Amino acid sequence: MDLLVVVHIKSSYDGWKAVFDADPAGREEFADDTRTRVAKVDDNTAMVQLFDVDMQKMFEIINDPNSPVADVMADHVEKRDVYKVEQMSPPN
């Protein structure tokens, strides 16, 4: 499944991006990280495109209270809006 994630940042884009680039979640464990794309909307918003996501694995990693992701992201992320992305077929 392909996703578009709108990240609402409570620190700053640069602070969040440094953590995102360090990859404490181990994105390669649940998505094709070679295709991951990140865009800055403004200093408190980013858009992340994830491809071939294993939703179960992602859920387990992101929500594991023992994961290093939980504490680090709590300092930087207010919330995430997650959207499923599908290719559209042309109308008949």
Predicted regions and their residues:
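Short, well-ordered beta-strand segments in beta-rich or mixed alpha/beta enzyme
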Residues: 2-9, 37-65
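Unusually extended, aromatic-enriched hydrophobic runs near protein termini
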Residues: 1-2, 31, 49, 91-92
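Short, low-order "capping/linker" segments at domain edges
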Residues: 84-92
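Helix N-terminus capping/helix-initiation residues
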Residues: 12, 42, 75-77
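Short acidic, gly/pro-rich beta-turn/loop elements at beta-sheet edges
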Residues: 15-17, 58-60, 92
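An amphipathic, aromatic/His-enriched active-site/gating alpha helix that lines ligand/cofactor pockets
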Residues: 21-37, 53-84
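Short, surface-exposed ligand-recognition loops at beta-strand->loop->(often short) alpha-helix junctions
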Residues: 8-19
